[in-house]
């Protein structure tokens, strides 16, 4: 899990999801999982 100001897709499997006003990137690769904050 990375906390970043700008979340971007890193690979093709990354998905951008908005959950309770928090923008997240979910991916099979744990290194690619991000949260905006």
Swiss-Prot record:
Gene Ontology molecular functions: structural constituent of ribosome
Top-level taxon of origin: Bacteria
Classification via InterPro entries: Ribosomal_bL36 (IPR000473), Ribosomal_bL36_sp (IPR035977)
Keyword Ribosomal protein: yes
Pfam families xref list: Ribosomal_L36 (PF00444)
GO annotation terms (biological process): translation
GO cellular component, one term: ribosome
DNA damage keyword on record: no
Key words, A-Z: Ribonucleoprotein, Ribosomal protein
Family: Belongs to the bacterial ribosomal protein bL36 family.
NCBIfam families noted in UniProt: rpmJ_bact
Protein name, per record: Large ribosomal subunit protein bL36
């Amino acid at each position: 899990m990375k906390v970043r100001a700008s979340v971007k897709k890193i690979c093709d499997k990354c998905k951008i999801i908005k959950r309770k006003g928090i923008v997240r990137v979910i991916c099979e690769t744990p290194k690619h999982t991000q949260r905006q904050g």
